[in-house]
From Swiss-Prot:
InterPro entries recorded: Cation/H_exchanger_CPA1 (IPR018422), Cation/H_exchanger_TM (IPR006153), NaH_exchanger (IPR004709), NHE-6/7/9 (IPR002090)
GO molecular function: potassium:proton antiporter activity; sodium:proton antiporter activity
Stretches the record annotates as Disordered: 675-726
Membrane-protein topology: Multi-pass membrane protein
Species annotation: Mus musculus (Mouse)
Protein name according to UniProt: Sodium/hydrogen exchanger 7
Post-translational changes noted in the entry: N-glycosylated.
Topology Lumenal: residue spans: 43-70, 117-175, 232-251, 299-323, 437-443, 500-514
Subcellular location: Golgi apparatus, trans-Golgi network membrane; Recycling endosome membrane; Cell membrane
Positions carrying Phosphoserine: S546
Physiological role: Golgi Na(+), K(+)/(H+) antiporter. Mediates the electoneutral influx of Na(+) or K(+) in exchange for H(+). May contribute to the regulation of Golgi apparatus volume and pH.
Family statement: Belongs to the monovalent cation:proton antiporter 1 (CPA1) transporter (TC 2.A.36) family.
Biased composition (Low complexity): 676-685
Length: 726
């Protein structure tokens, strides 16, 4: 008989008599494992949070330290500028004969550079060197995965292996080393614009032919002579085993281009203080202004030289002419862009009421002028050329449309910016000698460079002066030529061009050599300017009317027909007697209309059309344009022209004189350019009228053999007073 279901033991009933605690024993390992995992997770999470907090704290400390170092570096340069300003003020009261404040600013920079280089401790633990291989060139941007976190790094340049543990570990030295683009986009525009905006056009255009010859032909000659001589030096370095990397012929030409950029700021400052001869000042200033523009375009053309074939540095006629075309295209395009920007600014200031708000007017003028540089660079042209001709155009047209307050503000604004930028660059040059990380010193290359620039300057000045004197009636004397040869300083432009590209071994050697050349020329040549003026018997103390006197239309006596190398003759209150033959004047006047026709045409076009269109001055367009352009003429002519037919004048603007600007004074008689006279005989009046018939072209014909400028009466050449444009 089978037992019943009630008597049969079931699974639950078998353990019914056991304790509940004993039933949990099999689950204990599982529960313990989960608890341990949960505890480990909690502890790891807390550790991760602590680690993240520590990283954030370290990042904040690094950011704070970086901000502090930035403030210290900027404060360093501000203190350098402050010290330079105080030095300039001191030099105004007590001049040091053989030292200029520009050279002293470089000395201040050197002292600070030594302190930063050897007096600041090197940081450690922040930089690590990692080795990697790549088939291509160095990456400009690198994305690094560090434990699941991605960090972005940017390329700063190649570092020589021997300097990894020295300069590169000093964060302070990194802070005071600026990006080269800072010089081009921030510091150079106000310097170049001020040169064009403050240009004394009367003296500049009187010597325009010679200035263009020195700036274009002279710079090209200097570039190729220096480049070829330095190529010989490089070959010598290779023979003696002092060349550790590649140095091509195109690199030598590039060095010749950048080192041909003269910047006689020290000499010109001394000329201005001593009131040296205005023609010598105009030649040096005009050459340096255009020379900078030519040098930067020439260097860009050399960089663009790419011959066909495997050897990218061999001579190729097609590539050469292509580089010449690039030079002409960049220069003409930059010139056009600068002039167009100036014209647009003139139109905006003419056809708006901005003159009622001088602050807005000055701000717009400033932004339009600065944007010219950036616009040219963005379009592939050269901003230096564009902003230079923008400044000249602004001074010739836009200046007339500005209110009196805006005129003063704009001049003072760019003068201050020019002063600060230039002194900042010279102070930074001294600093860079010890803080720059990529110096390559080569004694043979440095000595060869000094010899090459001396020979290049000599080949630049003397042969060109000889050929120019063949066509100039007023010769460039030997003392002027020696002074121009002596005044070939290198400065801000050469430094900015050299520091812009220091990626290769050759460019680093160029930068170091350029820096030393700038030091030498500023200290030695700048300090020897005053003794050289005395030794060459160049006259100083040539007074020129102030701007206030010009605005009040006071008379200024202008010496015509006199060699600027000679001492000024004695004069009295009514006239100056110049030595010469009156018949030469009559013979010279016959060639006036043949030699100055280009300038006459430009002056007529500018006076009758451009000035009335772009400014509030000049004759009404209704009288100069054809009748069928009457509507357009009425729209473009300013109402001020109808109210006041007398043209508004700008400071030193019209480099060609009008008939009314010319008056001859002889004894108690006055003869105007149109032949009218007072207290004088009719025959003499008619004679003087014939001699001064082409008086509006006389100023132009000073250069390149453009006729004789002597005006005589009864066999005695005279000097006539000119009414300076206000």
């Amino acid at each position: 008989m089978e037992p019943s279901d009630a008597a049969r033991p079931g699974p639950g009933r078998a353990f019914r008599g056991l304790s509940p605690r004993l039933l949990l024993l099999p689950l204990l390992p599982v529960l313990l494992g989960r608890g341990l995992r949960a505890g480990a997770a909690a502890s790891s999470g807390a550790a991760a949070e602590d680690s993240s907090a520590m990283e954030e704290l370290a990042t904040e400390k690094e950011a704070e330290e970086s901000h502090r170092q930035d403030s210290v570096s900027l404060l360093t340069f501000i203190l350098l500028l402050t010290l330079t300003i105080l030095t300039i003020w001191l030099f105004k009261h007590r001049r040091v004969r053989f030292l200029h404040e520009t050279g002293l600013a470089m000395i201040y920079g050197l002292i600070v550079g030594v302190i930063l280089r050897y007096g600041t401790p090197a940081t450690s633990g922040h930089d690590k060197s990692l080795s990697c291989t790549q088939e291509d060139r160095a990456f400009s941007t690198l994305l690094v995965n560090v434990s699941g976190k991605f960090f972005e790094y940017t390329l700063k340049g190649e570092i020589s292996p021997g300097k990894i543990n020295n300069v590169e570990q000093n964060d302070m030295l990194r802070k005071v080393t600026f990006d080269p683009e800072v010089f081009f986009n921030i510091l150079l525009p106000p310097i170049i614009f001020h040169a064009g905006y403050s240009l004394k056009k009367r003296h500049f255009f009187r010597n325009l032919g010679s200035i263009l010859a020195y700036a274009f032909l002279g710079t090209a000659v200097s570039c190729f002579i220096i480049g070829n001589l330095m190529y010989g030096v490089v070959k010598l370095m290779k023979i003696v085993g002092q060349l550790s990397d590649k140095f091509y012929y195109t690199d030598c030409l590039f060095f010749g281009a950048i080192i041909s950029a003269t910047d006689p700021v020290t000499v010109l400052a001394i000329f201005n203080e001593l009131h040296a001869d205005v023609d010598l000042y105009a030649l040096l200033f005009g050459e340096s202004v255009l020379n900078d523009a030519v040098a930067i375009v020439l260097s860009s053309s050399i960089v663009a030289y790419q011959p066909a074939g495997l050897n990218t540095h061999a001579f190729d006629a097609a590539a050469f002419f292509k580089s010449v075309g690039i030079f002409l295209g960049i220069f003409s395009g930059s010139f056009t862009m600068g002039a167009v920007t100036g014209v647009v600014t003139a139109l905006v200031t003419k056809f708006t009421k901005l003159h009622c708000f001088p602050l807005l007017e000055t701000a717009l003028f400033f932004l339009m002028s600065w944007s010219t540089f950036l616009l040219a660079e963005a379009c592939g042209f050269t901003g230096v050329v564009a902003v230079l001709f923008c400044g000249i155009t602004q001074a010739h047209y836009t200046y007339n449309n500005l209110s009196v307050e805006s005129r003063s503000r704009s001049k003072q604004l760019f003068e201050v910016l020019h002063f600060l930028a230039e002194n900042f660059i010279f102070s930074y040059m001294g600093l860079a000698l010890f803080t720059f990380q990529k110096h390559v010193f080569s004694p043979i290359f440095i000595i060869g460079a000094f010899v090459a620039i001396f020979l290049g300057r000599a080949a630049h000045i003397y042969p060109l002066s000889f050929f120019l004197n063949l066509g100039r009636r007023h010769k460039i004397g030997w003392n002027f030529q020696h002074m121009m040869m002596f005044s070939g300083l290198r400065g801000a432009m050469a430094f900015a061009l050299a520091i812009r590209d220091t990626a290769s071994y050759a460019r680093q050697m160029m930068f170091t050599t350029t820096l030393l050349i700038v030091f030498f020329t500023v200290w030695v040549i700048g300090g020897g300017t005053t003794p050289m003026l005395s030794w060459l018997n160049i006259r100083v103390g040539v007074e020129e009317l102030s701007e206030e006197d010009q605005n009040e239309n006071r008379w200024q006596y202008f010496r015509v027909g006199v060699d600027p190398d000679q001492d000024p003759p004695p004069n009295n209150d009514s006239f100056q007697v110049l030595q010469g033959d009156g018949m030469d004047s009559v013979g010279g006047s016959r060639t006036k209309q043949e030699s100055a026709w280009i300038f006459r045409l430009w002056y007529i076009f500018d006076h009758n059309y451009l000035k009335p269109i772009l400014t509030h001055s000049g004759p009404p367009l209704t009288t100069t344009l054809p009748a069928w352009c009457g509507l357009l003429a009425r729209c473009l002519t300013s109402p001020q022209v109808y109210d006041n037919q007398e043209p508004l004048r700008e400071d030193d603007s019209d480099f060609i004189l009008t008939e009314g600007d010319l008056t001859l004074t002889y004894g108690d008689s006055t003869v105007t350019a149109n032949g009218s006279s007072s207290s004088y005989t009719a025959s003499t009046s008619l004679e003087c009228g014939r001699r001064t018939k082409s008086s509006s072209e006389e100023v132009l014909e000073r250069d390149l053999g453009m006729g004789d400028q002597k005006v005589s009466s009864r066999g005695t050449p005279l000097v006539f007073p000119l009414q300076e444009n206000a």
